[in-house]
Amino acid sequence: MARRDYAQDRESIKTFLSEFCKCDDDGKKEFVYGSQLVKLAHREQVLITIDLDDLAEFNESLAEAVVDNCRRYTSIFSDVIAELLPSYKQQEVHAKDALDVYIEHRLMMESRTRNPMEQRDERNSFPSELMKRFEVGFKPLSTEKAHSIREVKAQHIGKLVTVRGIVTRCTEVKPMMVVATYTCDRCGSETYQPVNSLSFTPVHDCPSDDCRVNKAGGRLYLQTRGSKFVKFQEVKMQEHSDQVPVGHIPRSMTIMCRGEVTRMAQPGDHIVVSGVFLPLMRTGFAQMIQGLLSETFLQAHRIICINKNDEISDKDAELTPEELEELAQDDFYERLATSLAPEIYGHLDVKKALLLLLVGGVDKRPDGMKIRGNINICLMGDPGVAKSQLLGYISRLAVRSQYTTGRGSSGVGLTAAVMKDPLTGEMTLEGGALVLADQGVCCIDEFDKMADQDRTAIHEVMEQQTISIAKAGIMTTLNARVSILAAANPAFGRYNPRRTVEQNIQLPAALLSRFDLLWLIQDKPDRDNDLRLAKHITYVHSHSKQPPTRVKALDMNLMRRYINLCKRKNPTIPDELTDYIVGAYVELRREARNQKDMTFTSARNLLGILRLSTALARLRLSDSVEKDDVAEALRLLEMSKDSLNQIHEHQKGHVPNTSDRIFAIVRELAGSGKAVKISDIMDRCTTKGFKPDQVDKCIDDYEELNVWQVNMGRTKITFM
């Protein structure tokens, strides 16, 4: 780095602050920093943020120097602003706090007692830190890329860097001493000691001329009323899951926040921090233990909280027109579903449900009450049906995800822990897996192995999407806007059809009802299916990739970007679909009342249908839900219920074939009447999971048996 002339830079900074202007929409010149200096002079604003893009436009080499030596230039900017402020003061400013009154009183006393011809003692003059009632921060260049924590290394020491991650812990905001003021017990003079680090050694002996000449030996006592304090907070930030290489532990970084950048984030927030990367030498007993090693921290200048739609990453760049055209094919829904874990054979409907979980529904907030849009799914089944593999793939695909197991997770580890802060010794909150997966997916394997007291911590998260904490005097609510993907094994090794769902999974009904879809994946012997599965597994084992199929699997990065694009849509449900959705829900309740349904059917199922429908509309990049979306959502719900119900029908010895089941649906639609529209039959049967060719075959079979007649246009069936 070239040597800089700081005196010349001071003049450039003074010119920049007073003369830099931009033209507004009307073509008028607007002095960007001049207006901020007026507010600073009138104490209407505390923080002045210097945009380095503006500085680069004015003087590019100066902007580069600020980035390379940020701490020094922060001090220079602060001194220049302190010089300029008196000229921008247009009116008298009244005292706003005790320190203002104190400074005003001391200046008045000094002007009275001091002889104008007398040289003022510099040691008793007010230090510049005491007189400055503003803060300076820098906004990084727009071309600056947000780094991951492991990318910030030794070459960034002293430079302005931008880092992104997730907040895991925040301390309470405490007052930090900037200038210590002492009063002598003999001569009454005041001494000031600027504090530039986290610790300092208090001054005891009075340095004034009176005590030194007279050898009075005056003692200094700290005067907190006249000292200056700023707000201080320490934040712990951890890498995002997508930034951690496989097999590595996520790294963390300490963020030191001072003044106006405190209270900008809480545990679970995804943030982008711009600040100065600096070493921290410990003192006292910690230095004896630490030796020559030093810790590092980031002195924050700017903190931005980002949500799921504002992810700052090169991977989340906009899709190109060619990629959108590739995804806009007729079979894009099937193609996206088959691209989920293509190495795993089959489970197409399960993969479709997992795709909708990644996209999610739309949150609703009527009158302050929140109705969640995130979709929760529980996969149950026999061992060896690739439940854990599906969870692992979803964990890798989701931008924000946490993977944990039931046996290795405690309630505290999932929600939040109260930790003792090593800096202040006070209790602080540290977010758990559900907090860290905020606005993402939390995959919990071996869900049935969790202890009951730990599992109760998930109840609030799955419906209210928050975590309420009341521990060690800390009472707060953390965000946990997360989709739960759980995998559970039957309690008896394999699913026992003689027992109910609760007895097989051993999960409480209150928890099972919070899942939008409960899917039972069985390992049933079937020669043709077993042959295809064995060929698929041996091919994957030999070639380390999935077998060639008619549909080419999409790249994981492309899928991630498309899902991110889908999440920006907020589709609504038109009024004309209301009767259709209500009728479908009433039918579900009727079947449950007739004890045909082994699962739970409650009002949560209706909300689940709405969530799945809006997720399907999002997947089409549409702004409104269509009837086909609702029909597909109902079909997935029926398929998940059938996975549980069919096994119990098998156990009872009555296994109706497809045509018999379709006939029962048609008979039910007809009721006491004789005629039924074929379009109504198609809608109801596809909702129940039947294919159109199966419905056509059933109609033809029963027409041959003279059970009903079909009109010439094949639009209506009339029973004989």
Swiss-Prot record:
Keywords: ATP-binding, Cell cycle, DNA replication, DNA-binding, Helicase, Hydrolase, Nucleotide-binding, Nucleus
Superkingdom to which the source organism belongs: Eukaryota
Function summary: Acts as a component of the Mcm2-7 complex (Mcm complex) which is the putative replicative helicase essential for 'once per cell cycle' DNA replication initiation and elongation in eukaryotic cells. Core component of CDC45-MCM-GINS (CMG) helicase, the molecular machine that unwinds template DNA during replication, and around which the replisome is built.
Motif Arginine finger location, chain numbering: 513-516
Enzyme Commission numbers on file: 3.6.4.12
Catalytic activity: ATP + H2O = ADP + phosphate + H(+)
Subcellular location: Nucleus
CC terms in the record's Gene Ontology section: CMG complex; MCM complex; nucleus
Protein's name according to its UniProt entry: DNA replication licensing factor Mcm7
Enzyme class: hydrolase
Membrane spanning stretches: none
Other facts noted in the record for this chain: Early fractionation of eukaryotic MCM proteins yielded a variety of dimeric, trimeric and tetrameric complexes with unclear biological significance. Specifically a MCM467 subcomplex is shown to have in vitro helicase activity which is inhibited by the MCM2 subunit. The MCM2-7 hexamer is the proposed physiological active complex.
InterPro entries linked: AAA+_ATPase, MCM, MCM7, MCM_CS, MCM_dom, MCM_lid, MCM_N, MCM_OB
Residues annotated for ATP 2 binding in this entry: R514, R604
CDD domains found in the cross-reference section: MCM7
Complexes and interactors: Component of the Mcm2-7 complex. The complex forms a toroidal hexameric ring with the proposed subunit order Mcm2-Mcm6-Mcm4-Mcm7-Mcm3-Mcm5.
GO molecular function, one term: ATP hydrolysis activity
Positions of ATP 1 binding: Y345, G384, A386, K387, S388, N489
Main location: nucleus
Residue ranges of every copy of the MCM domain listed in the record: 332-538
Signal sequence, start to end: none
Species annotation: Drosophila melanogaster (Fruit fly)
Designated gene of the protein: Mcm7
GO biological process, one term: double-strand break repair via break-induced replication
